[in-house]
Every structure is written in C-alpha cells, then in structure tokens.
Design a protein with these regions (language model features):
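Conserved RNA-binding domains used in RNP assembly and mRNA/RNA metabolism
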Residues: 1-81
Length: 81
C-alpha cells in the first residue's frame, strides 16, 4: 500500500491527513489505514479520542491526494514502526 497525503475539502483547505490509501469502487471510496493528521510538520492522532487508525472517507470529502515529502514520510514511518 502506498502512503499518501490527503488534502481535505472542508474548512480552508488546510487539513492534511496521511496514511496508507486504498481507492475502492463504491462509496465510501477511500480507505485510509494508519491515519494521522499533519499539523505544523508533526503527526497527531486522528480522529482524536479514538484508538481507531483506519478510516473510510467519501470522495466528496477529499480535495486531492498527493505523495508525501521525504521528511513527512520519515515521520510517518517512525510512528508506525
């Protein structure tokens, strides 16, 4: 599975999630495994108040999906060792 960054649509397009992304044929069409939120270059648990790290998202909630930078990928790999 490829680690990707998801830029979420709601708000001011400044909410970034990172995880292993699988695109599915039906809604909810995006599975994010090992999901974290990126805040100021650091990873925070997401969603808060839950130990669940795997999420299903609908395609209309996501603005775009991009590859992570080397630095943030390194941070992600550290928390998922």
């Amino acid at each position: 599975l490829m680690v990707k960054i998801l830029l979420m649509k709601h708000g001011t397009l400044n909410e970034y999630l990172i995880g292993k992304v699988t695109e599915l044929d039906e809604e909810p069409s995006i599975l994010v495994e090992g999901c974290y939120k990126i805040v100021d270059g650091k990873l925070e648990t997401y969603p808060k108040y839950s130990s669940q790290r795997d999420l299903f998202l609908t395609s209309d909630a996501v603005f775009t999906i991009v590859d992570p930078s080397t630095e943030i990928l390194g941070e992600y790999q550290k928390v998922n060792e």
